[in-house]
Amino acid sequence: MAAGTDIGIDLGTASVLVYVKGKGVVLKEPSVVAFDRNTNKIKAIGEEARLMLGRTPGNIVAVRPLRQGVISDYTVTEKMLSYFIYRTVGKSLFGRKPRISVCVPSGATEVEKKAVEDATYQAGARDVSIIEEPVAAAIGAGIDIAKPCGNMIVDIGGGTADIAVISLGGVVVSNSIKVAGDDFDEAIVRFMRKKHNLLIGERTAEDIKINVGTVYKRPENLTMDVRGRNLVTGLPKTVTVTSEETEEALREPAYQIVDAVHNVLERTPPELAADISDRGIVLTGGGSLIQGLEELIEEKTGINTMTAEDPLTAVAIGTGKYIEYLADDDKKSKNK
C-alpha cells in the first residue's frame, strides 16, 4: 500500500475498525489482547485473542485495553494500535507514516483525548486528528452536517452511548453516558445468575443478546438453550431462555439510554428541536442493533427513529471521511 496513506480509526471498547481513503473499511477486529503474564509478551490480538476470553491458562491473560470508550491500559492499547496500523498500511516507505484520524466519545476529557492522541502517535502516525464519535457517526450515516439544520445521532458502542444534536458541522447539545452494549451483556449475566442460578461468560451473554435479546416486546417469544455452571451444584447445566426474559433483563440499561435521549432533547434549542421532529433520530453503533431499540425510543419520545444503513461501520467511515475533509482543506490552503 502507498506511503503516506490517510486512515480513520474507530477505536472502540468492543472492536477496532480501520477505514482507508479510497478503499473503505478494511479491518474490523475485537479490541482484545492476550499476553503471557510471566514474560509480558503478547500472544494474540483481535479475533484470535477474543476466542481466548475466559478460556486461558493461568499465565495467559486476555484483556480489553479500552473501557467505556477510553484507554484503560495505555501500553497495551499502543501495541494493539501498532499491530492494526501495520496490518492496514504495511511498513511505511521512505519513513512516510500515515495520517490518522481517531474518534473519542463526546464526553471524553482533555486528558483522555490526549492519551488517545499520544498512543496513536506512538503506534506510528505522522499526524493525528481527534473527532467526536457523534460527528463521525453522522458523517458515516450520510448526513450533511455542514447544513444549518438539526440532526440527532444516538451512537451506541460497546462502552458508551453518545447522544448529540449536530448543526453547521458541530455539536450543539450532547450527552455521553457509560451505558452501552457491554452493559447489555452484563445485565444478562446478572439476570441468569439471579433467575436461573446459572453462571455464564460474556461471550455467552453476547450470544443471548444477539439471538433472542430484545428491549421491546417481540411479535413472537423466541427461545434459546444456554449452557453454563450451576451455582448450587457447581456442575454444567443447560437452561432455556426466552426473549421475554431478556426484555426484563435489559430494561434498566435500555431505559438509561432513553433517559439520556430525553435529556438532550430537553436542552435542544426550539428551532433545532423542530428539525429533529421532522427528520427523526438516527441510531448508529453495534449497540443500536439490539432488537426493539428503535421502537422503544420512538414510543418514549414520539419522534420517528431509524437505524443507519450500516450502523456498525458508520463511525469508522465518518472518521475516515473526516481525514479526507482535512486533506482537502490542506490542499485549498496550499493553493491560496
What is the predicted function of each stretch?
Residues M1-I156, A164-V282, S288-K336:
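Nucleotide/phosphate-binding catalytic cleft detector across ATP-hydrolyzing
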